[in-house]
Curated annotation (Swiss-Prot):
Alternate disulfide bonds occur in equal amounts. Keywords: Disulfide bond, Milk protein, Retinol-binding, Secreted, Signal, Transport. Residues 1-18 form the signal peptide. Primary component of whey, it binds retinol and is probably involved in the transport of that molecule. Disulfide bonds join 84-178, 124-137, 124-139. It is found in: Secreted. Its main location: secreted. The gene is LGB. This is Beta-lactoglobulin. The keyword Signal applies. Synthesized in mammary gland and secreted in milk. GO terms for cellular component: extracellular region. Pfam families: Lipocalin (PF00061). PANTHER family: GLYCODELIN, LIPOCALIN.
Length: 180
């Protein structure tokens, strides 16, 4: 019992914490998220996930496509080996409409936090596997313009999460994101 209390005390003192996203959208209609999107802002729990152009989770979402099975196909672009590479990720549906399983980019979940379907979509990619727990979130918009309302909602959603780096893009950068 003493060892258990000591271990618990050390864990709390050392700041060991799980990254948990508690806010996901209720009643997501996957068909309404279909179409073209632009990555307006990104944030991550670990600076190394976004700090360089070729960082592991610095990806630019281009399009979301619901599949007939209820999964979500994510088309994105990412810098690899000094050039822009097109990627396709299949996010598998779960029992929770706004949560999807993935096996890509070293992540294992995609969580939709919020969307109005017409202007913005906020989502996070989570890796809950020990010891490399990580979280990266993005604010997507339908047009290559800065949407202040979407950014405010993104910042509000991030307040409850352990984010250490945040990037935002202006309209010129949105148009010039990693294009193949």
């Amino acid at each position: 019992m003493k060892c258990l209390l000591l271990a618990l005390g050390l864990a709390l003192a050392c700041g060991i914490q799980a990254i948990i996203v508690t806010q996901t959208m209720k009643g997501l209609d996957i068909q309404k998220v279909a179409g073209t999107w632009y990555s307006l802002a990104m944030a991550a729990s670990d600076i190394s996930l976004l700090d360089a152009q070729s960082a592991p989770l610095r990806v630019y979402v281009e399009e979301l496509k619901p599949t007939p099975e209820g999964n979500l196909e994510i088309l994105l672009q990412k810098w690899e080996n000094g050039e822009c590479a097109q990627k396709k990720i299949i996010a598998e549906k779960t029992k929770i409409p706004a949560v999807f399983k993935i096996d890509a980019l070293n992540e294992n979940k995609v969580l939709v936090l919020d969307t109005d379907y017409k202007k913005y979509l906020l989502f996070c990619m989570e890796n809950s596997a020990e010891p490399e727990q990580s979280l990266a979130c993005q604010c997507l918009v339908r047009t290559p313009e800065v949407d202040k309302e979407a950014l405010e909602k993104f910042d509000k959603a991030l307040k409850a999460l352990p984010m250490h780096i945040r990037l935002a893009f202006n309209p010129t950068q949105l148009e010039g994101q990693c294009h193949v």
